[in-house]
Amino acid sequence: MSVDISNFPNLALADTPVELRSLPFERLPLLCNELREYLLRSVSRSSGHLASGLGTVELTVALHYVYNTPFDRLVWDVGHQAYPHKILTGRRDRMQSIRQKDGLHPFPWRGESEYDVLSVGHSSTSIGAALGMAVAAESEGLGRKVVAVIGDGAITAGMAFEALNHAGDVHKDMLVVLNDNEMSISENVGALNNHLARIMSGKLYTTIREGGKKVLAGLPPVKELAKRAEEHLKGMVVPGTLFEELGFNYIGPIDGHDIEALVETLRNMRNLKDPQLLHVKTKKGKGYEPAEKDPIGYHGVPKFDPDECTLPKASGGKPSFSAIFGQWLCDMAAKDEKLVGITPAMREGSGLVKFSQQYPDRYFDVAIAEQHAVTFAAGLAIADKKPVVAIYSSFLQRAYDQVIHDVALQSLPVLFAIDRAGLVGADGPTHQGAFDISFLRTVPNMVVMTPSDENECRQMLYTGYQCNQPAAVRYPRGSGTGIEVQTEMQVLELGKGRIVRNGKGTAILAFGTLLQQARAAAEALDATLVDMRFVKPMDEALVLSLAASHDQFVTIEDNAIMGGAGSAVNELLMRNKQCKPVLNLGLPDRFVEQGTQEEIYALLGLDSTGIQASIEAWLQA
């Protein structure tokens, strides 16, 4: 059920940016209040990302009010903060469907709206893409403006600084808005800074500034002295020296919840030449006290009653795989003081909270820097430490060269705990863990393990930690079967699977937690069922022995079929001249859409019913 728009009279008049720009300026504060309340009421009914969007209401309104979107291009980074943008760009009445199957995409998505100029989901891409658009805009000569909005977390990533460096070098007209909601850069926010921002973005100041640069450019000693004096004086007021050094005109910080200051400053900056950076201070969760107090807890929320000012407590059911990993990490750290835990800004999601509290000196959150996380781990391993990198499958894609060049090439003992492998559900195609088996199994020296349940996950983490070479354990989002997890840890024999059920005719080789869904098919078909455990090294002897006693194979995995574990089985059989029919079940050759995990597994035929139906249809063909 959607939110009744009749309770929001000003928002009702701004279904699109064109309608928004027709509103008198004086009504914008009321509009912002209604937009924030509508967002809260909508997300609380649908679930989704809340705190970030609450903090960008005024900024979103100001950007669409000043810029002629969609002709002017507005590029959002990651997209957690873009819910107000979706509401104002013709999607207000569909917000209750966000992150649901066949509903609105959780992030800006090009196929969904002409206002979404860049499909996003991973961080730190906005500036690079916006620069490309700015270069194209200059060549077309139509006066098109380009704006990138990036958070203070995302801007710490290497590729964001690569783009800033390039933008400052090519001097194209573009605006980068730094949405600073963590007080990690500066706390100098208030009336004085808002006033300074208006002055510094105004025509008079800009003319004097640029004119002065041209005059001083002909006087090298004076130019250098003036530059140093400007840096010294400016550093006393604003923290923009770094951005100025990169070639940007820095303005701010200003209050990101002062709609009047935002609109006036953006109007001034819209006409400025060369790269501009506006530093905006916002409060994550703004306007909803529980979210302001706990922005991490309210970052992504389930359905809840906002009037109760509390989120529903998670049921005390089966532990998640992330929790299994977190407990293993603490247990292992107690046994081995060489253990070091590393995460690229995913402490809560990866289950590292307890470890970070118990072992703060051995815990490193390297921020959104996946490439650095892996090479940092390599350095630790060289220095006789035992690094464990906790990372989401989709984010490990960013560090593939570092996995190969910095870890595997030197066969360093780095353990990769790969969370969110397989289908993650509501976050959609940008976050599905569809490719890690494919890109890791091709890497020499790498051990790749796929636990079928929580206990295997714990034992495989221990096995990878002890194997003295690069190793990866991949496990899905959510909980497992509820099987008892053994406290005692044991090293599994590398490359050895186990037969779960003996049958005849068909051998089903399961990689990972889809073993549970394959059980019903194995029973119905009287097939042999194998928990393969290892993608690399694979249990070749077991597969070949099954080839001698079975007529056909079925492989099952929650990874892309192309290049996945099933492909490894195919290669093994062909290499040994075992020409057996093989049905490979897994993720198709497309970017898999959003929905609940259960919905998408069923859609792809990877639930119990679908697996059995696929095998039966294949056998009868």
Swiss-Prot record:
Residues noted as binding thiamine diphosphate in the record, renumbered to the chain: H80, G121, H122, S123, G153, A154, N181, Y288, E370
InterPro entries according to UniProt: Dxylulose-5-P_synthase (IPR005477), THDP-binding (IPR029061), Transketo_C/PFOR_II (IPR009014), Transketolase-like_Pyr-bd (IPR005475), Transketolase_BS (IPR020826), Transketolase_C (IPR033248)
Designated name of the protein: 1-deoxy-D-xylulose-5-phosphate synthase
Cofactor: Mg(2+); thiamine diphosphate
SUPFAM superfamilies, sorted: Thiamin diphosphate-binding fold (THDP-binding), TK C-terminal domain-like
Alphabetical UniProt keywords: Isoprene biosynthesis, Magnesium, Metal-binding, Thiamine biosynthesis, Thiamine pyrophosphate, Transferase
Entry annotated with the keyword Metal-binding: yes
Biological or metabolic pathway of the protein: Metabolic intermediate biosynthesis; 1-deoxy-D-xylulose 5-phosphate biosynthesis; 1-deoxy-D-xylulose 5-phosphate from D-glyceraldehyde 3-phosphate and pyruvate: step 1/1
Residues annotated as binding Mg(2+): D152, N181
Subunit composition and interactions: Homodimer.
Cofactor note: Binds 1 Mg(2+) ion per subunit.
Role of this protein: Catalyzes the acyloin condensation reaction between C atoms 2 and 3 of pyruvate and glyceraldehyde 3-phosphate to yield 1-deoxy-D-xylulose-5-phosphate (DXP).
Sequence similarity: Belongs to the transketolase family. DXPS subfamily.
One Gene Ontology biological process: 1-deoxy-D-xylulose 5-phosphate biosynthetic process
Pfam families: DXP_synthase_N (PF13292), Transket_pyr (PF02779), Transketolase_C (PF02780)
One GO CC term, this protein: cytosol
Alphabetical list of Gene3D superfamilies matching this protein: 3.40.50.920, 3.40.50.970
Record GO terms (molecular function): 1-deoxy-D-xylulose-5-phosphate synthase activity; magnesium ion binding; thiamine pyrophosphate binding
